[in-house]
Regions:
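Amphipathic helix/helix-loop-helix segment enriched in hydrophobic residues with interspersed Lys/Arg
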Residues: 1-358
Length: 358
């Protein structure tokens, strides 16, 4: 088995997305959160766009949602009910699952077993005003603001073998629900959507939705050099760990000369560096120079290096299973280059391991 770092006091969460419970360690996005909230307040709608791995989901879950829950004023006061879902390949069904989970539309927080079917029937019958009907007939109507988060809308376009948006009416209905609901400005229903930059232009083909996109778009850029300095200040410097100017210069060059987002790379890099530095602090050596950086490796290569180290740490059986696991994702379909899925059952059969191990 691979060694695990001591994460007890580590403010970095590696390659994971930030969640609501990580809000206290979600640094350097405070101004962007307030800027995005001003759009929500004026439009009741926010479209977050950005490059792949720029941190859109983290921005929503650890930035916007905690701030909204903490007394952000809407039409119905400062109390909110929030549902958050990905459209996947069944956008309407997934919306109804989100609506019927966790009692979001009840004061008591207890939903009924019939809610999913009831909501699905209402939307299928009422079409674009289905959400309005559901909200008007629920317990939180006029008592709480209702926020619907549709994260990673690119799901609708990235898996053509499973969901063909040119043939299906469901994504049209989803966007009709959004645009029609927003016309009822006094209800207190709000929307946040996120989509990668490469697919954002597809939204312009939905007439009613396209009319509100230009005033509601928020571009989330990857972390820049000033963001990195702010993160370092609130984490490393707070523990009296200082960085050599040469190291900072290297970071500056890296983020300015790299086209793709390095957010995940820096998250993993800082997590490993923080563990090393805390260990060194016990030896009165809280200083980060090039020598210490070399212990971890280059930021832009750290994910591949970490995977190689993990592979090396496995026994022969583990290595064979990991090789089979990655082989199961080999894709010869030109339509799915860039985004590819594989069914769990296929992976299980190909690797020949049980559910618990997988």
């Amino acid at each position: 088995m691979a060694k695990k770092s001591n994460t007890k006091n580590n403010p970095f969460i590696s390659l994971n997305s930030y969640k609501d419970n990580n809000k206290s360690i979600f640094y350097s996005r405070e101004k962007q959160v307030e800027d995005a909230l001003s759009i929500i307040q004026s439009s009741s709608f926010l479209a977050i766009t950005g490059d792949v791995a720029s941190g859109k989901s983290s921005f929503i879950n650890a930035g916007l949602i905690p701030r909204i829950k903490n007394g952000f004023n809407g039409i119905n006061g400062n109390q909110w009910s929030i549902v958050n879902f990905r459209p996947g390949i069944s956008p309407i069904e997934n919306l109804c699952h989100a609506l019927s989970s966790d009692g979001n539309l009840y004061i008591s927080d207890k939903s009924k077993t019939t809610d999913y079917n009831d909501y699905l029937t209402t939307i299928r019958e009422k079409n674009s005003i289905g959400l309005v009907e559901i909200y008007r007939n629920c317990e939180i109507f006029s008592k709480k603001n209702f926020l619907i988060v549709i994260d990673q809308l690119e799901d609708l376009y990235n898996f053509p073998d499973l969901f063909d948006y040119n043939e299906s009416d469901d994504e049209d209905l989803l966007f009709d629900l959004v645009s029609k609901t927003l016309k009822f400005k006094d209800l207190g229903i709000y929307f946040i959507i996120s989509i990668d930059t490469g697919n954002y232009k597809k939204l312009s083909s939905y007439d009613d939705l396209s009319k509100i996109l230009s005033s509601s778009q928020f571009i989330l850029h990857p972390l820049n050099y000033n963001d990195l300095k702010e993160i370092i200040k609130k984490t490393f410097n707070a523990k009296n760990i200082q960085f050599d100017s040469e190291v900072m210069d290297q970071f500056n060059v890296l983020v300015n000369e790299t086209d793709n987002s390095l957010n995940p790379n820096f998250q993993l890099f800082f997590k490993k560096l923080y563990d090393i530095c805390l260990s060194d602090l016990n030896q009165q050596n809280g200083y980060v120079n090039s020598e210490k950086i070399d212990q971890i490796g280059d930021v832009d290569e750290i994910i591949s290096v970490e995977l190689e180290n993990f592979y090396s740490s496995l026994d022969e059986k583990g290595k064979l299973i990991l090789e089979k696991f990655f082989r199961s994702f080999i894709n010869f379909d030109k339509k799915n280059i860039g985004y590819y899925y594989q069914e769990y059952s296929y992976i299980k059969n190909y690797t020949d391991i049980d559910d618990e191990y997988l």
